Amino acid sequence: MNPVQQPAQHKCPASSLNPPHPKRAQEAPDMGLYCDNFMYQQHNLHPSHRATNFSIGDFTHQANPYLWLGGPGVNNSPSYSPTPAPYIPPAFSAPQRQFLANSAAFGGADLGWMSAASQEELLKRVRPPYSYSALIAMSIQNATDKRLTLSQIYQYVAENFPFYKKSKAGWQNSIRHNLSLNDCFKKMPRDENDPGKGNYWTLDSNCEKMFDNGNFRRKRKPKSETNNIKIAKREEDHVSPKGKESPPMITPSSPKELSPTGHSKCPSPPTVTYTPCLTNFIGSMTAVDSATMNRQGPLGLLNELSQRNLNGLSSFISGSAVDQSPEHQDSSLFYNRSPYYSSLPTSNQKQPPYLQQLHPQQSPLYQGRY
């Protein structure tokens, strides 16, 4: 027996490779009734039996999000059958209408295909795309005298827009705020012959064009006004720049101290009151000086320097012993420091009597060195 020829005897019939699927073929038209834009692809069916005439317009989104603003109805797309499949099953289908035709109150809504209760419920849930300023302007423009009171504006909004019937407190406060803050609405007092409560509100003639499309367009400031504000701010920043201001420095020659001729007044040196401690210190230093002068040897230069320092200290005391007025006593240490640091005394300065007694006479040996 030839093993090569054995698989040829067990060949499967050709009909068993492609079994029929009658059930799936029958389901495709039924699915077209419920799935409008759904394409069910079957790989076992011939492509000639499939409709491929879909267009982009069938999948476009409606530009207007509100149903009652007047958009076209639902577009039916063709399915597998030559006739287009309806959006609703045939048992419940009805002739399609445009959702909203133009009406006087809302700018377009013909809900004849819905019951009255369904229409009212739909309008209560959908908020009108108008601002509160636009609602006020619409109510005033539709009035005969072009003026309304606050209660009449409330009544107009509630009657023409059912959305505002459910919660009156919130939107009524917004209406009042817009009337008081918006410059386009002017308050008119009542006449004497017109009894009633509340003033009238009217629309400014200069703002009528701001409500052309129903919505309120905010009024822009003129360019000249904005330019003037910018120039004023720049001038203020230039005159007094922030962060660059420094506190005024206190100088000895302030404008208050200047004389009428423009020269500053120089105060005289104040007096210094001496304590007994300072007197004892001077006496001890004099005693040390007299003791060192008696020594001989290499300490002669040191004795000379100490003698000069003592003479400078005595000159400081003698120069400040002049009597001065009491108003200069507080600043005595500030104006009278320079004589203290001068080590060489002047010839014109005289020592007080009590200091002359403390200093001994210099010997002729050291007088020649000066």
From Swiss-Prot:
Residues 232-245 have a biased composition (Basic and acidic residues). Residues 1-28, 212-269, 342-370 are annotated as: Disordered. It is found in: Nucleus. The keyword rRNA-binding does not apply. Keywords: Developmental protein, Differentiation, DNA-binding, Neurogenesis, Nucleus, Transcription, Transcription regulation. It holds the Pfam family Forkhead. Residues 127-221 bind DNA. Residues 349-370 have a biased composition (Low complexity). GO terms for biological process: anatomical structure morphogenesis; cell differentiation; determination of ventral identity; ectoderm development; nervous system development; positive regulation of DNA-templated transcription; regulation of transcription by RNA polymerase II. Initially localized to the animal hemisphere (the presumptive ectoderm) of early-mid blastula embryos. Becomes restricted to head placodes, excluding the otic placodes, by the tailbud stages. It comes from the Eukaryota. Induction: Induced by Bmp-signaling. Suppressed by Wnt-signaling. GO terms for cellular component: nucleus. GO terms for molecular function: DNA-binding transcription factor activity, RNA polymerase II-specific; RNA polymerase II cis-regulatory region sequence-specific DNA binding; sequence-specific DNA binding. SUPFAM superfamilies: Winged helix' DNA-binding domain (SSF46785). Transcription factor. Essential for ventral specification of the early cephalic (head) ectoderm during gastrulation, playing a role in the non-neural versus neural cell fate choice. Binds to DNA via the target sequence 5'-[AG]TAAA[CT]A-3', with 5'-ATAAACA-3' being the preferred binding site. This is Forkhead box protein I1-A.
